[in-house]
Amino acid sequence: MNDQMFVETLIITSSFFAIAVVLVLSVLLIERIG
């Protein structure tokens, strides 16, 4: 059972989540340094 749509959605969601985490960590790091 290979659900292509589910795989693509999972990849897009994980990528978006990773980018969001990086942005949040960057903001926290800048505020801590600044």
Curated annotation (Swiss-Prot):
Predominant location category: membrane
InterPro entries attached to this UniProt entry: YoaI-like
Task: Write out the annotated subcellular location.
Answer: Membrane
Identify its membrane topology class.
Answer: Single-pass membrane protein
One GO cellular-component annotation of the UniProt record comes to:
membrane
Name the keywords, alphabetized: Membrane, Transmembrane, Transmembrane helix
Task: Name the residues that span the membrane.
Answer: 10-30
Q: Which domain of life is it from?
A: Bacteria
Q: Read off the NCBIfam families from this record.
A: membrane_YoaI (NF041475)
Q: What is this protein called?
A: Uncharacterized protein YoaI
Q: Give the species this sequence originates from.
A: Shigella flexneri
